[in-house]
């Protein structure tokens, strides 16, 4: 149903985001739109287990989704998952408990005519972890890197090996945070790593930061969020020198105590200089506006259009939000818009 080259897909068979093809029957086109509305791509996965092969012996195509609640970690037992399923026609279960919870890996393949396909890993999980990534310079000490709060992944470092966890979700969810702490203990035991340094995000309210600050590991190091993005990009491309990093990220606690967003950072993996940035915006509703883009749009429009016209501009494009927009602006401090 989709045109895509699979020459770069690894044998672990991750979910691959494929571009929808317009040259399909109407009912298939409608099905694809229902699966991923307003999205040019759909996730496709080949069978990677004997159970999948048995099921697909009777079906040409299966639409699959996870059994866990949104933002919740994978359920490991029948007792955890069955109460949340509600009314379903059939349940296929097994007595084996899921001991090491791991989401599916997700990959995107870039295809350009005349060029070799390039596979980009968007979520490194099942089939890829905990196989370590190789570092260009060995570390003299064992390190625990806690990661951020959203779409969390932590890492353990020993020598030239960086052992990344699977995708753990958003840590503001209590069950996800509990799983985060448990997975750290399990991986430390698995690889017999005893960190002497713990690295965390600068954001003081991040659950991962608070975990690090409460840790018994004495040496702690805070890293600015956007600098971490720059360092990750340099490492992924095996670039050891300086570079200009343009980081368009939703949120990051800055070294000046404000929330950063679109940043131009000049530096390397060890240090960087903030040489440019987007103009600061009002964040209606605080950091919650990061999850609701219309609030950020409202914050950008307020100083340009004023309160009344900004509300009308946002409400015109999303009429269902008119009341919410109006109430939010009324709740904001009276400033000279």
Question: What feature does the model see in each segment?
Answer:
Residues 1-337:
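Acidic, glycine-enriched active-site microenvironments
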């Amino acid at each position: 149903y989709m045109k895509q080259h699979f020459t770069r897909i690894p044998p672990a068979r991750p979910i691959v985001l494929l571009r929808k093809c317009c040259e399909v029957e109407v009912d298939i086109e409608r099905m694809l739109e229902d699966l991923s509305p307003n999205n040019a791509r759909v996730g496709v996965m080949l069978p990677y287990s004997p159970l999948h092969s048995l099921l697909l012996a009777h079906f040409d195509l299966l639409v699959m989704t996870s059994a866990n609640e949104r933002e919740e970690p994978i359920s490991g037992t029948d007792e955890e998952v069955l109460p949340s399923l509600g009314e379903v026609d059939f349940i296929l279960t097994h007595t084996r408990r899921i001991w090491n919870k791991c989401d599916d890996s997700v990959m995107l393949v870039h295809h350009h005519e005349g060029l070799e396909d390039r596979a980009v890993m968007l979520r490194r999980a099942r089939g890829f972890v905990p196989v370590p990534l190789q570092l260009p310079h060995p570390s003299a000490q064992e390190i625990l890197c806690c990661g951020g709060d959203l779409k969390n992944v932590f890492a353990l470092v020993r020598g030239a090996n960086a052992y990344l966890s699977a995708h753990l979700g958003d840590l503001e969810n209590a069950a996800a945070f509990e799983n985060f702490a448990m997975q750290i203990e399990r991986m430390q035991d698995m690889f017999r790593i005893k960190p002497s340094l713990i690295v965390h995000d600068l954001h003081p309210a991040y659950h991962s930061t608070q975990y690090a600050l409460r840790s018994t590991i004495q040496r702690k190091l805070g890293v600015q969020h956007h600098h971490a993005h720059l360092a990750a990009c340099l490492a992924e491309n095996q670039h050891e020198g300086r570079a200009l990093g343009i980081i368009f990220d939703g949120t990051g606690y800055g070294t000046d105590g404000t929330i950063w967003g679109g940043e131009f950072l000049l530096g390397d993996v060890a240090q960087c200089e903030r040489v440019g940035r987007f103009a600061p915006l009002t964040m209606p509703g605080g950091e919650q506006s990061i999850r609701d883009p219309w609030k950020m749009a409202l914050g950008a429009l307020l100083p340009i259009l004023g309160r009344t016209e900004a509300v009308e501009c946002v409400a015109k494009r999303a009429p269902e939000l008119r009341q919410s927009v109006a109430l939010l602006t009324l709740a904001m401090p009276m400033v000279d818009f």
